[in-house]
Regions:
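Charge-rich, low-complexity N-terminal segments
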Residues: 1-125
């Protein structure tokens, strides 16, 4: 690979969770408890290794991602330390922080609410 090229690999995941935004005024739809089907993608970048010609073993990625997703799945996000204000942006930061040490080469975490057509992407650099 050349200096101008970078190889990226991604792993998708999903979780179901509820949240609310207590800082919104009464009557605002987000102030009430509501839930979403969330989807996410983690992206790693690097050079394929000589041993297996991959950037990172997808099984290892899946294992790390599943561990973090399980902390979110079927939970009230507001009750999770660090997600007291559980916006898409905050969820992306939460996931990134918990995977950063486990997945060398992590460059981005994307969190989506597909039914709403919304997403937030936290990208290194």
């Amino acid at each position: 690979m050349t200096d101008q090229m970078r190889l990226e690999i991604s792993k998708d995941f999903a979780f179901e969770a509820a949240h609310y935004f207590e800082h919104e005024p009464e009557g605002h739809p987000f102030s009430r408890l509501h839930g979403h089907s969330f989807a996410g993608t983690v992206t790693l970048a690097g050079e394929p290794n000589a041993h297996a010609a991959w950037v990172k073993d997808f099984w290892k990625i899946e294992t790390a991602v599943k561990e973090v997703a399980e902390t979110l799945d079927h939970r009230l996000l507001n009750e999770i330390e660090g997600l007291e204000k559980p916006s898409l942006e905050a969820i992306a930061a939460y996931v990134f922080a918990r995977l950063d040490d486990k997945l060398p080469g992590l460059v981005a975490v994307e969190i989506r609410r597909p039914s709403c057509g919304e997403k937030a992407v936290l990208r290194r650099g």
